[in-house]
């Protein structure tokens, strides 16, 4: 596509502007100009020579030539301005370069916020720099004091470059506070030795991963460091911080929130929540295209979640969840926790596919306060269960739990206080009625004359 007739003087002005900023006498063809603009870095070679206007006054060029030049200008100045060809020479002459070694936060066009330390604006992660901010390494007294606070909702991931590592930065308070759309932080090992992490990740509700190949923990101030990080899962054992977790959990290994990218033990399943009220839990990331999708998201199979806020049916969607199906591929996981999965889903009345699950460990609060009237565990192997704490608590409409006649809980390594709290409608297959005196996990067994329980063999 062409832009129509273009005055050659416009091209000469653009080329002269490039030559002036670079201090060169180079002759540029129209298609070379965008690359030449992108290559400008504030260096003046001291050999500027302007070229006169051409005798040919006009010509026709593809639209893409000027689109590319405009993109290159925006890549240099970090603005979103739309440039007409006649505006481009002035825009090039107006370019200024942020030079000198300093810590910068660079917002890239893919939503990455890169922190690095170089003598000029440049990206290691890759992409086009949209905006640049100088980082005050002495720290910030609030989130709003950060130079990059205005772009916090545009950040999809953060990258901390190795050039930061040797600077001795100790105060990272509020750095990632309220990055509500950020799912991961990479290069966290380059912040080893920080001492102040106050509200560093507060209200990062979509944050799943903080990657680090190593980390030296010297944190002494960490108030509300992980407050609201309901989806953050450590890569070793699925550890999930609480809203009050201190900086001591900022570590690799058991009980740590960090993940070594070279030793990530986590696997993920997906919850596809459809407009008809059903959620399908599956190992398949792609939802059913023939159904209207309300929400979708992934859940860590080994995640030791500590409350609500990690499922697609959380917040405003929760009351709309009426049925759940576990797909056949949910049996493919080597380890699976269902902690808080349907907690307080008060309209959830139907759950199918429990027999498709395998290697289930913790079912802490899994069905708490649901509206189910019966559950079918036939085909479910209980031998790996470790935790049934409040699993069915508050299921006041639950009348029947079916299981295979061979059902047997592990003889050790399992707990589950108040597993059946307030399940006042529940009756076992041999007629054992729920009692407030028998709410422990031990009653999750087949009801017989010699071993009363709340399960019905089928």
Question: For each of these PLM feature ranges, what is it?
Answer:
Residues 116-168, 271-274, 278-333:
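LRR flanking "cap" motifs
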Residues 110-112, 153-168, 180-195, 204-220, ...:
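Structural signature of tandem-repeat unit edges
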Residues 171-175, 196-202, 221-227, 337-341, ...:
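Consensus positions within tandem repeat domains that build extended binding/scaffold surfaces
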Residues 1-100, 324:
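Surface-exposed receptor/substrate recognition regions of extracellular proteins
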Residues 7, 62, 99-111, 264-277:
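N-terminal module-boundary/linker segments of secreted carbohydrate-active enzymes
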Residues 252-261, 444-458:
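C-terminal capping region of solenoid repeat domains
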Residues 42-46, 94-103, 259-268, 458:
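Low-complexity, Pro/Thr/Ser/Gly/Ala-rich linker/spacer regions in secreted
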């Amino acid at each position: 596509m062409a832009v129509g007739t273009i005055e050659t003087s416009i091209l000469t002005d653009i080329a002269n502007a490039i030559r002036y900023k670079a201090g060169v006498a180079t002759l540029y063809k129209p298609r070379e100009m965008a690359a030449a603009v992108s290559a400008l870095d504030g260096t003046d070679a001291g050999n500027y020579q302007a070229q006169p206007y051409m005798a040919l006054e006009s010509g026709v060029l593809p639209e893409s030539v000027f689109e590319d030049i405009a993109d290159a200008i925006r890549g240099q100045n970090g603005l979103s301005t739309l440039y007409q060809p006649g505006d481009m020479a002035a825009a090039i002459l107006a370019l200024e370069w942020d030079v000198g070694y300093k810590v910068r936060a660079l917002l890239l066009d893919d939503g990455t916020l890169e922190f690095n330390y170089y003598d000029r604006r440049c990206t290691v992660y890759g992409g086009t720099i949209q905006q640049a901010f100088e980082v005050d390494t002495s720290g910030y007294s609030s989130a709003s004091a950060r130079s990059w606070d205005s772009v916090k909702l545009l950040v999809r991931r953060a990258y901390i470059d190795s050039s930061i590592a040797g600077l001795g930065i100790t105060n990272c308070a509020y750095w990632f506070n309220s990055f509500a759309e950020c799912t991961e932080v990479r290069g966290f090992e380059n912040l080893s030795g920080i001492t102040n992490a106050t509200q560093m990740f507060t209200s990062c509700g979509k944050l799943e991963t903080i990657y680090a190949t190593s980390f030296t923990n010297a944190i002494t101030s960490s108030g509300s460091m992980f407050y609201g990080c309901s989806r953050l899962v450590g890569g070793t054992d699925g550890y999930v911080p609480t809203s009050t977790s201190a900086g001591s959990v900022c570590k690799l290994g058991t009980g740590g929130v960090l993940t070594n990218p070279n030793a990530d033990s986590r696997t993920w399943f997906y919850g596809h929540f459809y407009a008809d009220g059903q959620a399908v839990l599956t190992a398949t990331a792609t939802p059913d295209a023939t159904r209207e999708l309300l929400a979708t998201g992934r859940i860590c199979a080994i995640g030791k979640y500590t409350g609500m806020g990690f499922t697609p049916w959380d917040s405003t969607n929760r009351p709309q969840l009426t049925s759940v199906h576990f797909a056949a591929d949910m049996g493919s996981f080597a380890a699976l926790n269902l902690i808080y999965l349907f907690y307080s889903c008060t309209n959830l009345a139907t759950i199918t596919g429990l027999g498709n699950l395998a290697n289930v460990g913790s079912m802490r609060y899994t069905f708490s306060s649901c509206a189910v009237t019966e559950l079918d565990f036939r085909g479910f192997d209980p031998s790996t269960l470790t935790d049934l704490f409040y699993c069915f608590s508050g299921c006041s409409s639950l009348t029947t739990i079916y299981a295979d006649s061979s059902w047997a809980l592990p003889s050790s390594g399992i707990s589950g206080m108040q597993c059946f709290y307030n399940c006042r409608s529940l009756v076992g297959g041999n007629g054992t009625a729920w009692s407030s005196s028998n709410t422990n996990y031990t009653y999750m067994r087949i009801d017989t004359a010699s071993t009363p329980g709340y399960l019905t063999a089928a």
